[in-house]
Regions:
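Short alpha-helix
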Residues: 56-72
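Short, glycine/charged-enriched secondary-structure capping and boundary segments
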Residues: 13-16, 43-46, 91-93
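Structural motif corresponding to alpha-helix initiation and N-cap regions
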Residues: 12, 61-62, 86, 125
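Histidine- and/or cysteine-centered catalytic micro-motif in compact active-site loops
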Residues: 4, 33-35, 81
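A short glycine-rich, Lys/Arg-flanked "PGG" loop and its adjoining helix->strand segment in the class I
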Residues: 12-27
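Conserved class I S-adenosyl-L-methionine
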Residues: 27-58
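Conserved Class I S-adenosyl-L-methionine
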Residues: 75-144
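A short SAM/SAH-binding and catalytic strip from SAM-dependent methyltransferases
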Residues: 1-11
Length: 144
């Protein structure tokens, strides 16, 4: 699963369903945004209320591990992976302008427009070839 775990209404049930459909020894790989890194996501400095929304919506690394171990999984590993979200700040602004990010979709039109304007202002002065990079939590769980 990649960057969707926070969107499930019943995360415990989602983990139990993974356990149900996997054979013993089966693996779940989960790439997820976590509250532990919420302040470091690239759009947070530009969209003021995004930090509060992230803190409300995301789970911590510990909570995610607990959900899966409670559902019958063993934690195999956790690491932070470097994820390039855009090749440049300008490309990142264009990507966010589509307004498909589930966190930014919760902002009012005024909040979103102000944040996008601030991001575009930053993009205008950033090096053209500077990629936008975030650290994302990557988990591996094994069914026991």
């Amino acid at each position: 699963m990649s960057m969707v775990f926070h969107r499930f209404d019943d995360r415990d049930q989602a983990a139990r369903e993974c356990h149900r459909v996997l054979r013993r020894g089966g693996t779940v790989c989960l790439r997820a945004a976590t509250i532990d890194r919420a302040g470091s996501y690239a759009y947070v400095p530009f969209f003021a209320r995004s930090s509060a929304i992230l803190n409300d919506v995301l789970q911590s690394q510990t909570v995610i591990e607990t959900i899966f171990t409670s559902a019958g999984f063993q934690s195999v590993c956790h690491e932070l992976v470097r994820s390039e979200v855009a090749g440049s700040w300008g490309a990142y602004a264009n990507k966010l302008a589509l307004r498909v990010d589930s966190i930014l979709a919760r902002l009012s039109d005024q909040e979103f427009d102000a944040g996008l304007a601030a991001l575009r202002e930053h993009a205008a002065t950033a090096p053209l070839d500077e990629p936008v990079v975030e650290l994302v939590d990557f988990f591996v769980f094994r069914s026991v």
